[in-house]
Amino acid sequence: MSTPEEYTGKKNKDEMPDPVGWDAIDAAFDKMYPGQDNPIHFGTLIPWRLGGPDPLQGVSAYDGGDYFHLVTYGLSDLYEKEGGDPEYSGYGLEFTLKLRKAGYEDEMSELKCIASIFNDVARLTFENGEQFYPDEYIYTGQELGFDRQQKSKLTGFITALDEAGTIDTPNGKVDFVKLIGATDAELKAIMEGKLRVRELAEKIGDLTDYTRESVI
């Protein structure tokens, strides 16, 4: 995020009335990570609707032991229902990513980097209407890794349904779409029809691991 505000409490949501969508996301992750009532959180100072640069209203990072489990806030309706789809909330999804605690020294810097990537991808939805679903790939065309130091071999993503699944909120359903880091060679194999997304997911697992080598 371009101007992240770091805090442990979720201040932004408390400034708005009835954050029913936000609370539903919290509840889903609180269930998976009990006792983490105040995870690391990055919020935006100026909301998108008021001219801010970042479409997401926040990103939280839960501690999973050997990984961080990040989740976005803002692709779904966090407060009142605004989207026109009677079944789904907002765009119908939030992004997640499980970042292994390896291959970097500054954890906060890497978490900020993932938050920035989330915003870059979400911007495609907000500006172009592009939707993202499980079992797809995101090819960036870049040659350097997307980690802060650009030392990893991960340049893009495949997607899968997060273990948080799909939740029902007062504003409609929300799918948690997990981004999983993939190498350029792996993504090209998918694009060329040599490998399916699910096949790659079975090979690499669901953690984004900056230290791993390409399986292709």
Residue ranges and their predicted role:
Residues 1-82, 86-91, 95-216:
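Acidic, proline/glycine-rich low-complexity IDRs
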